[in-house]
Design a protein with these regions (language model features):
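Activity-critical C-terminal alpha-helical subdomain
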Residues: 179, 430-464
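Short, ordered loop/turn segments at secondary-structure junctions
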Residues: 75-78, 98, 138, 260, ...
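N-terminal accessory segments
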Residues: 1-37, 67-69, 308-324, 414-419, ...
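C-terminal substrate-recognition/cap domain of FAD-linked oxidoreductases
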Residues: 25-33, 215, 219, 230-233, ...
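FAD-binding subdomain of flavoenzyme oxidoreductases
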Residues: 100-254, 458
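N-terminal flexible segment immediately upstream of the FAD-binding catalytic core
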Residues: 1-62, 79-109, 262-274, 323-347, ...
Length: 464
């Protein structure tokens, strides 16, 4: 049979075993399956299959493996690295129908959910039980659990709770040949052999498809304190971070730093935003803590910032007095979503490195880009407490975007940093992975891929 006949037979088989409504082809494949949020290289898949259970996923992958049919796994399509965007000849396996919280155990503080469950649904289920699922992203209403696990998502509270890798106790995944690996562990301690779930966390669907997961929950804490601080040096940023950690400890839940390039640009271009400071400063730190004793936590918070102000570590600070203040501070930090259209065309980077290397790295970026491209707008902010910087760089010329990416990723490699801190590699960063991984590491990744997916059908052309 030729390729068309093989595909026709495959879709007929899947329709018979899963139901006709589980297989979309031809005009029934909508544009929403053509591209993720990156917007790069949109292409409709040749068909879309919509499983409702782990057994359905196993059936799909078994038949696709036997037919040699490439598969792209899709969730909420909120990724920024092109990992869920179809490539030529691929069938899309969409997890959107595998949605729902299966159980919540208050005693163990765990929640079990299907991989197509939106993050916000998980957060709300935890909140209704008086608990907290701490991972939070701007795309919370759309992004799905499976994609979060596949990319090892981070968010604003990594400094306290870690990446999602730290929040997953167990999971269920389906290998490329349809084998189901059920490792639905619910314990914090389990050293019974290899921790197989790690094969599927952060590997972007290249080694298997996550279908269910057991997540850690935490107590909700009433004592939230938020402040926006102004600083005149990166040394002050580091000193303030260490002071907060020393005096407030594990209550620190967010430490977001904005360089003036970003802060001033957002204030200027988003009409609803206002700076709480009378003048501009080189750097700004948004700090948030969450504790158990509202009055005591607020006292320690104010005392720590007061000492930093008196010693000259910070030049000014505004402590939130209401939820409206909290929202206005975070609106500045999250203002990037409001200004990307004004920046177009731009290079977006999500990198990480040792905190001490950040000033030198940024100086190198500015110097080398200016020498090569002339005037450059470089907006910088990030989760400095967990080594992560986000850069949005533009010259106003589309032709400069790819050369800028290559130049900055090379500098990242020179500082032994990572070309992807939290957004994944996908298809768009694949060519830059060698800046952050040795040839031996890359070969080991390829060996794992060949072992678990010998026919190479799962998310090919991504990561490695």
């Amino acid at each position: 049979m030729d390729g068309a006949d093989v595909m026709s037979e495959l879709l007929t088989t899947l329709s018979r075993e899963l139901g006709e409504d589980a297989v979309l082809g031809g005009p029934d494949v909508s544009d929403k399956y053509a591209v993720d949020v990156s917007g790069e290289n949109p292409l409709k898949p040749i068909a879309v299959v919509l499983p409702r259970s782990t057994a359905d996923v196993a059936t799909i992958l078994r038949h696709c493996s036997e037919a040699g049919q490439p598969v792209v796994v899709q969730g909420g399509l909120t990724g920024l690295s092109g990992g869920a965007t179809p490539q030529p000849g691929e069938l899309a396996l969409s997890l959107e129908r595998m949605s729902g919280v299966e159980s919540l155990d208050r005693a163990s503080m765990t929640l079990t959910a299907l991989s197509g469950t939106p993050l916000q649904v998980i957060q709300e289920a935890a909140e209704e039980a008086g608990l907290l699922f701490p991972l939070d992203l701007g795309a919370r209403g759309t992004c799905q659990l499976g994609g979060l696990i596949a990319t090892n998502a981070g968010g604003n509270q990594v400094i306290r709770f870690g990446m999602i890798r730290n929040l997953v106790l167990g999971l269920e995944a389906v290998l490329a040949d349809g084998t189901v690996i059920s490792s639905m562990n619910r314990m914090l301690k389990n050293n019974a052999g290899y921790d197989l779930k790690q094969l599927f966390i952060g590997t972007e669907g290249t080694l298997g498809v996550v279908t269910r997961a057991v997540l850690r929950l935490f107590p909700r804490l009433p004592g939230k304190c938020t402040a926006l601080c102004a600083l005149d040096s990166f040394a002050g940023v580091v000193e303030l971070l260490r002071a907060v950690q020393a005096n407030i400890g594990s209550s620190l839940s967010a430490y977001e730093v904005m360089w003036a390039s970003y802060f001033d640009y957002v204030i200027e271009h988003v009409g609803t935003l206002r700076s709480p400071f009378e003048r501009t400063y080189p750097l700004y730190a948004l700090i948030e803590t969450e504790g158990t004793d509202t009055a005591h936590d607020a006292e320690r918070f104010e005392s720590t910032l007061g000492s930093a102000l008196e010693s000259g570590v910070i030049q000014d600070a505004v402590i939130a007095q209401s939820q409206q203040d909290v929202q206005s501070f975070w609106a500045i930090r999250d203002g990037i979503a409001e200004i990307t259209s004004a920046l177009m065309p731009y290079a977006s980077l999500d990198v990480s490195m040792a905190v001490a290397d950040m000033p030198g790295f940024l100086d190198q970026v500015d110097e080398k880009l200016a020498a090569r491209f002339g005037p450059v707008t470089n907006l910088v902010f990030g989760h400095v407490g967990d080594n992560n910087l986000h850069l949005f760089i533009t010259t106003g010329r589309e032709a400069d975007v790819d050369p800028i990416l290559d130049a900055v990723y090379k500098i990242t490699g020179d500082y032994q940093g990572s070309v992807s801190a939290e957004h994944g590699i996908g298809a768009l960063k694949r060519e830059y992975l060698h800046y952050s991984r040795s040839s031996e590491e890359l070969e080991l990744m390829r060996r794992l891929k060949r072992t678990l997916d010998p026919n190479g059908i799962l998310n090919g052309g991504r990561v490695i």
